[in-house]
Amino acid sequence: MRLKTKIRKKWLSVLCTVVFLLNILFIANVTILPKVGAATSNDGVVKIDTSTLIGTNHAHCWYRDRLDTALRGIRSWGMNSVRVVLSNGYRWTKIPASEVANIISLSRSLGFKAIILEVHDTTGYGEDGAACSLAQAVEYWKEIKSVLDGNEDFVIINIGNEPYGNNNYQNWVNDTKNAIKALRDAGFKHTIMVDAPNWGQDWSNTMRDNAQSIMEADPLRNLVFSIHMYGVYNTASKVEEYIKSFVDKGLPLVIGEFGHQHTDGDPDEEAIVRYAKQYKIGLFSWSWCGNSSYVGYLDMVNNWDPNNPTPWGQWYKTNAIGTSSTPTPTSTVTPTPTPTPTPTPTVTATPTPTPTPVSTPATSGQIKVLYANKETNSTTNTIRPWLKVVNSGSSSIDLSRVTIRYWYTVDGERAQSAISDWAQIGASNVTFKFVKLSSSVSGADYYLEIGFKSGAGQLQPGKDTGEIQMRFNKDDWSNYNQGNDWSWIQSMTSYGENEKVTAYIDGVLVWGQEPSGATPAPAPTATPTPTPTVTPTPTVTPTPTVTATPTPTPTPTPTPVSTPATGGQIKVLYANKETNSTTNTIRPWLKVVNSGSSSIDLSRVTIRYWYTVDGERAQSAISDWAQIGASNVTFKFVKLSSSVSGADYYLEIGFKSGAGQLQPGKDTGEIQIRFNKSDWSNYNQGNDWSWIQSMTSYGENEKVTAYIDGVLVWGQEPSGTTPSPTSTPTVTVTPTPTPTPTPTPTPTVTPTPTVTPTPTVTATPTPTPTPIPTVTPLPTISPSPSVVEITINTNAGRTQISPYIYGANQDIEGVVHSARRLGGNRLTGYNWENNFSNAGNDWYHSSDDYLCWSMGISGEDAKVPAAVVSKFHEYSLKNNAYSAVTLQMAGYVSKDNYGTVSENETAPSNRWAEVKFKKDAPLSLNPDLNDNFVYMDEFINYLINKYGMASSPTGIKGYILDNEPDLWASTHPRIHPNKVTCKELIEKSVELAKVIKTLDPSAEVFGYASYGFMGYYSLQDAPDWNQVKGEHRWFISWYLEQMKKASDSFGKRLLDVLDLHWYPEARGGNIRVCFDGENDTSKEVVIARMQAPRTLWDPTYKTSVKGQITAGENSWINQWFSDYLPIIPNVKADIEKYYPGTKLAISEFDYGGRNHISGGIALADVLGIFGKYGVNFAARWGDSGSYAAAAYNIYLNYDGKGSKYGNTNVSANTSDVENMPVYASINGQDDSELHIILINRNYDQKLQVKINITSTPKYTKAEIYGFDSNSPEYKKMGNIDNIESNVFTLEVPKFNGVSHSITLDFNVSIKIIQNEVIKFIRNLVFMRALV
């Protein structure tokens, strides 16, 4: 059977060649016969069946020399198709017809069923100014039609890749129809593939909802639709729902791209593959090889070698390809596992003579070094330079001949050790040698020499070694000061060329520049330097000491100049986003324009923003978002040696290689920038050279200067400075294609929580930050005493536990929450009349139907008023949960779903409907969509009419006065561009609360939904806070007092629940435990995460010295605002003082680690704290997680049968708060059943626990439930059958398996005194004691 198949393919290939030749000779009346994968309709049209296609993408237009290698490798894996990237010449080098013919011929010869050809230059049209339109792509297809004709059975024409971004994507429908018509009019009969808008992910459902009309626009009905699945498709339900929407209508669909992770989120790749197979649709991964470094994880193979798959490639090969296709024979590949780091070896350095000076760097040898800095703190106990070695020559090089030198100062003589945690060439093939200079030179008294064993092999021309992860330290873990190290570049956190890391072949310097005062390495010798013998160091990792970014080294002040430079190749557009002259944050947003006639590599460009520091402090800068990628933007603070007019500093903005080429006439798109001082003290912008207060929209600002290769080409430096060197004539640069064929990030699928970001460059927009501290060492966890005394008294401390503390903003899979909140940034701009909302800074200020999409509301259902709220509340009713719904108070809501709202469309404009709290007219159940107003009283009345009053069984119980008003100017500048004032917030809160209480007196009013501590403290530096604060120490107390006064005047309580958000700022190893550290499981972060809940309640867990952390968590709040800690007692004291009877809600919170046991421990602790300390309502923010679910269910369903923790808190105390918190409860006033939550959060210390219970009944037995590090499944773990006198003891050994690699096993035995031993792995125990 297999032989017959081969013969048939051979003759079909011959026949295809004949048909192709006949077409070239213009011989008419030839009937094209269908081949494998094709079918012929009655009218002779060949329609390719895409349902059985499985393949990957090949980035041909950037790797034209890899065609044969790539296609053969792809076919060898058994894939039967490939999607090939072409260019029409608009952005990249045009792929000529002859080359396309070769692609087709080679693909046929390899036995592919069909191939897809696509034009990549359309990517992101409408949003990316460098992209071309579909109409321009059609012209290319016409140009190469001659080589496509006759291949209708084999070639699918993918008109253009991801032909719209997120701007103007509503035009996609007509543009696509017009492109199809143009191709058919030109005589194309091929199967045409149509890519979705929204960077291919169709989160707006534009393609889905218009697919039928698109199909009908094709006279041949020979179309297939292509969806790209990345972060938008992060759950199985979203994947299946989208696929079924096409399958159910009989419309052909292909998944043209997908990955296992991406910059925009975590796709559910398992569901994508499963449903593609189940519903029989074509499937193509991204991509074979050649992705840029920041998305290098999407490569299927290493170095184009099919026998060297990456983890992503191996997964796809095993799970997607499997045995579904007949592959070309290939050897079996066994993936090499990532090595577990071994203990760091100690190496004693050997002094060598100090070399003599040299001035010329060597940068033209056969190799070069790419460097990425993985330790950005200048003061640190561990230096982390990650490297790649590139063969830039024309012949292979044996890596054993290569050495690299990293130059630094030791800052205190000690033995040192180095290790490679992982290397693509094999960590065991990397060697280290510490070399001490006989005397110090500039920036170094040591270098670390990195070498390679013979096992590292040959490095081929144009290739690199792949990543080499390395770190080194001193034996006593004392600190280095990297700030003065020759080789350290603080801002280069992604790979780039660092000429201060030098490279040698046979000992001869071939790359980089040694420190001043050093000579090139001596002539080569035949004997390589031996690797020293090493001895292991102890298997401990101390907590690193970290400090803030130091003040930069002063540079000489230049001399005067009067003439600006404005005739260069680039210019700068500037928009001022902080109009207050006195501010703690400067916000210059920029665009760089190529005003020349040739392209320019952005890595050659720097921009300087000149200003006065107004009080010397360490400073930090961040790009919240940039169209070229925020991670591609770098910052450097430069201090002048003496002040000049308008400046004593400048911030230098640079660009990494990933920013790519800037084409003539194009701009970079928006670059959002902000910077601040470490103590958040104010700048006075009024005297700053570069600040133009009134220029809030983009315009030319010649006082923001620009440079190419350090030469001033735009603008005027401050008076008293000299310009950069005079510019020479501009050199025409031939564009080098940046190999970034991956999709531009797409929107996240859940509303982004309001966060307080750290000053590191990120790719996702974030709101205004709160202060980042000068960080001091993380306090060491104290050894636990030999016996932890737990005392429980069921007759004391009885308080009711609110059932509403177990709530969520996003339901956790496997948990039935008792309370639910409809909130977040999306709700500020939600229009209940049409169900549209605006994303604000979270996603391009897009107005769309995202909320409907995320809830599965479509078609006519999406047009029903308040459909989003109804879907939310009906789910709450189904689960008997409390609903808290956000009302709109910022002033405007989305009027349309047309995508991005530009700055010049800021409200008021025709993109917005104005919010009014009272209609002052009869309320309607059919709101007027054309009156330009949205009424809150009409909204509430609609909900009451549908579900009843709050006092009824089905009514909505709580209404929230909008979301995080302290950040409106940051999160929603198109709605509320100016900072909210204290006066405005109170006036709006009072007015809207009166509306609620008038319509539904029993409904609870939540306010003011503050985002975090600086919102508590000063309403995020509200412009009028200092004028209104009086004797109040923080805004919370003033707000409570004002709401109490208004309530007394109105005659009804206007604030039932003080609503706050809390995301801990605690850090371990300078990584925050949530957000950027969400998935971090290093020892430092795990300890910090498990201890972080103490800031909520523990008065001993804080520093005693302002500005210096002597105790408590490592956070800027503890460092500078410890008087306000712990949070819950401080807030409740002010409630009692200023508005007694007000309840407390924490309606957003998260502690990270949702899929790690440390996250489960922290969350279980937090829920216990909420119950014990009287929080009324709480809702976690964040995606589902296995250990997050376990933490909730230990309270809500600990036995899997619906059994719950009690509803009355009783006294429970521990002698060791640091290591073992405890919570206890009973049901009502009946203490015949006692529930105990016992948490062991000690990382590695032996514990013995004695539990002593005071109660009227005598307990005789107990059941133990819990979850462990092996599995988040909560389960029964044992029984205690003979408790005597209400006392029993547990013996808890220290954690097992803690090694230098910092992995956690949480192995614990529980020993009952009465000679009964129950062994299990756990870190959290739930016990139910019974009489």
Curated annotation (Swiss-Prot):
Region (Disordered): 319-363, 515-566, 717-780
Temperature-dependent activity: Optimum temperature is 80 degrees Celsius.
The CBM3 domain, residue ranges: 363-516, 566-719
Annotated InterPro entries: CBM2/CBM3_carb-bd_dom_sf, CBM3, CBM3_sf, GH44_cat, Glyco_hydro_5, Glyco_hydro_5_CS, Glyco_hydro_b, Glycoside_hydrolase_SF
Region listing for Catalytic (mannanase), in residue ranges: 42-325
Reaction catalysis annotation: Random hydrolysis of (1->4)-beta-D-mannosidic linkages in mannans, galactomannans and glucomannans; Endohydrolysis of (1->4)-beta-D-glucosidic linkages in cellulose, lichenin and cereal beta-D-glucans
MF terms in GO: cellulase activity; cellulose binding; mannan endo-1,4-beta-mannosidase activity
UniProt function note: Degradation of hemicelluloses, the second most abundant polysaccharides in nature. Contains two catalytic domains with mannanase and endoglucanase activities.
Documented EC number(s): 3.2.1.78, 3.2.1.4
pH curve summary: Optimum pH is 6.
Protein name: Beta-mannanase/endoglucanase A
UniProt biased composition (Low complexity): 323-335, 721-735
Signal peptide feature range: 1-41
Gene: manA
PROSITE patterns (alphabetical): CBM3, GLYCOSYL_HYDROL_F5
Residues at the catalytic site: 162, 257
